[in-house]
Amino acid sequence: MSVSDPIADMLTKIRNAASAGHESVDVPSSKMKWEIISILKSEGYIKNFKKMTQEGAGNIRVFLKYDDKESSVIHGIERVSTPGRRVYLGYKSLPRVFNGYGTLIVSTSKGIITGKAAGESQVGGELICKVW
């Protein structure tokens, strides 16, 4: 079955696995997904991730992170720009996620970066998702 929005599918798999208390989740691999997951790791939302290969099909295994009370570090993860409704903003218009406690992930001409890094680099782009 083909997926019309693979990024939203990945975010949904991570959200569902985190709410179910799973240790890890596998998502189909792509360069864009790899970049998004590496930002989630650098921002402290996941423990780790690694590439898994089975019979030519590549997957990314994402190891989820939980706090002391065994609740997920990811309280919410939401797709902003979809294939049917693209959202582009300049660097001056980039919104803050939960008053700066969340992270905005933006696809820019300099690659996929956080909203904070996009503001510092003075580049706008397509809003991929927000995490808090």
UniProtKB/Swiss-Prot annotation:
SUPFAM superfamilies: Ribosomal protein S8
Pfam families: Ribosomal_S8
InterPro entries to which the protein is assigned, alphabetical: Ribosomal_uS8 (IPR000630), Ribosomal_uS8_sf (IPR035987)
One GO term (biological process): translation
Domain of life of the native organism: Bacteria
One Gene Ontology molecular-function label: structural constituent of ribosome
A GO term from the CC aspect: ribonucleoprotein complex
Assigned keywords, A-Z: Ribonucleoprotein, Ribosomal protein, RNA-binding, rRNA-binding
Annotated NCBIfam families: PRK00136.1
Family to which this protein belongs: Belongs to the universal ribosomal protein uS8 family.
Subunit structure comment from the entry: Part of the 30S ribosomal subunit. Contacts proteins S5 and S12.
Known role: One of the primary rRNA binding proteins, it binds directly to 16S rRNA central domain where it helps coordinate assembly of the platform of the 30S subunit.
Record-given protein name: Small ribosomal subunit protein uS8
Organism: Treponema denticola (strain ATCC 35405 / DSM 14222 / CIP 103919 / JCM 8153 / KCTC 15104)
Gene: rpsH
